[in-house]
């Protein structure tokens, strides 16, 4: 049986793009707790996780960790916490982790290291300094975390861009973009950035099947599929036909 892993995107809240850290005063932190409650209830009702998983989702902004196979820990993050369109990202901006989500990620990676597990990090908005998606301070801290646990992290997986991309994590010396040496010998990990099912941004819907080593949990290859939007009108009774792209 396949295990469903849920990772919240920036359109999975109402209003969109918003996630509030739990340390806001005057009850402001609770204004989106209904979202985490709904996700927790969905995961439990669909059998994608147990009571422990459901409680993690409630207390980590929709994020959680799960071990679908022996030796593998999957850590799902709510990446709206570093998304540039989230207005709450700019409160206490000098603090790279006001939500303590990255502290929790570090704890999960430490537990994986202690248990000789490999880890997958799953999220929506990818980190980076291009100014397009994520703010700098959380990105700086996340690079430090990945550098520290690069031997434990098998891979990370993101989306959001609606395009077929990849991201290389490099050794971070002092936690800012200018200190990162983008030389081959300083590469520490990589992230797969999958294209989207939605045709938004004028793309054909796509899906990806990863081929994974069952011992190391490294991705050895993947198959990229797509379906032609032009064919949808004549497929209204059968659904899309997926074709192998490469």
Placement of each model-derived feature along the sequence:
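A short acidic (Asp/Glu
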Residues: 16-19, 130-135, 165-170, 203-205
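Metal-dependent phosphoesterase/phosphodiesterase active-site architecture
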Residues: 27-111, 115, 163-246
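Active-site-proximal segments of metal-dependent phosphoesterases and phosphodiesterases across multiple
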Residues: 84-103, 110-158, 168
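Catalytic metal-binding/acid-base residues of hydrolase active sites
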Residues: 10-13, 126-127, 157-164, 195-198
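Divalent metal-coordination and catalytic microenvironments
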Residues: 9, 77, 105, 121, ...
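A short helix->loop->beta-strand "cap" motif at the edges of active sites that frequently abuts
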Residues: 2-3, 151, 186-189
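Core catalytic region of metal-dependent phosphoesterases/phosphodiesterases
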Residues: 1-21
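Short, electropositive alpha-helical surface patch
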Residues: 18-35, 132-146, 174-178, 192
């Amino acid at each position: 049986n396949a295990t469903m892993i849920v990772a919240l995107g920036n359109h999975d809240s109402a209003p969109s793009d918003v996630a509030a850290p739990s340390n806001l005063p005057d009850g402001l932190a609770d204004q989106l707790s209904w979202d985490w409650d709904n996700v927790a209830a969905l995961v439990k009702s669909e059998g994608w996780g147990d009571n422990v998983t459901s409680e993690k989702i409630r207390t980590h902004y929709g994020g959680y960790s799960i071990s679908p196979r022996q030796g593998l820990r999957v850590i799902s993050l709510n990446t709206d916490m570093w998304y540039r369109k989230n207005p709450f990202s700019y409160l206490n901006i000098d603090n790279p982790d006001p939500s303590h989500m990255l502290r929790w990620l570090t704890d999960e990676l430490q537990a994986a290291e202690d248990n000789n597990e490999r880890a997958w990090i799953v999220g929506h908005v990818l980190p980076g300094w291009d100014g397009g998606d994520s703010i700098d301070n959380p990105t700086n801290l996340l690079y430090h975390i990945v550098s520290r646990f690069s031997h434990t992290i098998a891979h990370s997986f993101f989306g959001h861009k609606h395009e077929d991309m990849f991201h290389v994590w490099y050794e971070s010396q002092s936690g800012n973009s200018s200190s990162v040496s983008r030389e081959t010998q300083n590469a520490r990990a990589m992230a797969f950035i999958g294209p989207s099912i939605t045709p938004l941004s004028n793309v054909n819907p796509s899906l990806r099947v990863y081929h994974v080593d069952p011992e190391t949990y490294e991705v050895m290859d993947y198959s990229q599929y797509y379906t032609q939007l032009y064919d949808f009108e004549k497929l209204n009774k059968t659904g899309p036909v997926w074709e192998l792209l490469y």
